[in-house]
A protein has these predicted regions:
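Bacterial N-terminal signal peptides that target proteins for export
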Residues: 1-10
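Bacterial N-terminal signal peptides
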Residues: 10-19
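N-terminal processing/targeting junctions
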Residues: 21-23
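Glycan-processing catalytic domains of CAZymes
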Residues: 25-420
Length: 420
């Protein structure tokens, strides 16, 4: 297997400077079509930011787009998705909003990859969404006039049924109906210009697919559609990988891996946290390798780590790790813990995490927090005396009064990285 950095084809007229694939112009290279090289992929991951549900921005879309342009973002994560409420995709407005968002981002910078997500949830409301004929044909079935069938997506042993709440379950990837749904979602997103999809908790949906054969089958269909219809004839696929990433017969199923940051509390410094190889189920140093969907080989697939959101404990602000590893940090999920910190420490911590990854695992990249929901967020006068429900990296201003002001720090980190 190759070492971390692979060679670059001279025919593309590229240079490798400071770990970045550079075009002949001297700018980082973001060109791909039909497949993506490791260096171009890493250029994107190194300029990645989470912008949850940007298509219907909970803040100010104009200011969000301004921020993305200002900082030079190249990979805009989780910009459109469904968490339940599947009937929305049957409403033309949903995809129209998504298409307009993608178009506006590309007017500012056509190189940007905009990511959607297909998560580990289906609800009874999925029965309101018609199955198109082309989805039946993709899976070798005769088209019929019907809607997606919630019951056909569930685990036969009833595990994970009503997992999220009554009528809201984790789908079983081994079921053809589940594959049809995810294929339909992926194709619908590609049709509006989406070029990457995060497939959520892949192992949760694949608890009966330990060899990943069903995931491989789904992704074969998705990649086939991308080769015909996607903006650059390729879809960049990832998922959360607690088992370090799916490999089938030596071939990686995903283009990069993703996982939460898993901050470790500093026991004698309340609210402080660090990163550590080997802590809990953190991905550092253990991302699986193999042959990628684009054909290059690696010992460890590049990956993103993100400030995840998943709830909190009954003791917010108190240690969650005193008795051992926990996914919670000082009683909060990761993005909520981050939001509770003073502005100076938030900025310091972004520098710290960026540099820590460079030192401890150069296969890993920090996905900057741009926009994400909070659980039990900090109180704020701007929230009408209540708690802030959303983290915005935007500089605090009249356009974004609840901005947490990491915008210029993110820009400075990326600018410094470009100069190296």
């Amino acid at each position: 297997m190759n070492s971390h950095r692979g060679g670059i084809g001279a025919g593309l007229g590229l240079l490798l400077l400071a770990g970045h694939a550079m075009a002949a112009s001297g700018e980082p290279d973001y060109r791909f079509k039909g497949k993506i090289s490791r260096n171009v992929l890493e250029n994107y991951l190194s300029r990645s930011i989470t912008m949850t549900e940007l298509y219907r921005s909970p803040g100010n879309l104009e200011d969000d787009l301004r921020m993305l342009k200002n900082i030079g973002a190249k990979f805009v994560g989780r910009a459109i998705y469904l968490w339940g409420g599947e009937a929305r995709i049957a409403d033309p407005q949903f995809l129209a909003q998504g298409r307009e968002m993608v178009s506006r981002i590309h007017r500012n910078d056509p190189d940007v990859v905009v990511q959607a997500a297909a998560f580990e949830i289906v609800t009874e409301g999925i029965g309101k969404v018609p199955v198109p004929g082309w989805v039946f044909r993709e899976f070798g079935q005769k088209p019929e006039s019907r809607n997606f069938d919630y019951a056909k997506m569930l685990f036969p042993d009833k595990k994970m049924v009503d997992h999220w709440r009554r009528g809201s379950s984790v789908p079983d990837i081994c079921q053809v109906e589940t594959k049809m749904w995810f294929f339909f979602l992926a194709a619908s997103y590609m049709n509006i210009g989406i070029e990457a999809i995060h497939f959520g908790q892949l192992d949760l949906m694949g608890r009966n697919d330990r060899q990943y054969r069903n995931w491989a089958d789904l992704l074969k269909h998705v990649r086939g559609y991308a080769a015909r219809k996607a903006r650059r004839k390729f879809l960049i696929c990832d998922a959360h990988v607690p088992r370090a990433g799916p490999v089938v017969d030596g071939r990686l199923l995903l283009d990069f891996h993703s996982f939460p940051l898993r901050p470790k509390e500093v026991a004698d410094s309340p609210q402080k946290a660090v990163l550590a190889v080997g802590y809990s189920d953190a991905l550092y140093g253990r991302s699986n390798g193999g042959t990628t969907p684009s054909g290059w080989r690696c010992e460890h697939l590049p990956y993103l780590v993100e400030f995840d959101n998943f709830g909190g404990t009954r003791a917010p602000g108190q240690s969650s790790q005193a008795r051992g590893p926990s996914i919670f940090t000082w009683g909060f999920d990761e993005i909520t813990w981050f939001a509770w910190q003073p502005e100076g420490y938030r900025n310091e911590w972004l520098h710290y995490a960026w540099n820590w990854l460079k030192e401890h695992d150069r296969n890993g990249f920090l996905q900057m927090p741009g926009g994400r929901m909070l659980t039990n967020g900090p109180p704020s006068a701007e929230a009408g005396g209540g708690r802030i429900r959303w983290y915005f990296a935007n500089a605090k201003s009249a356009a974004c009064p609840q901005g947490f002001s990491q915008e210029e720090t993110i820009k400075a980190i990326w600018d410094e990285d470009t100069r190296k």
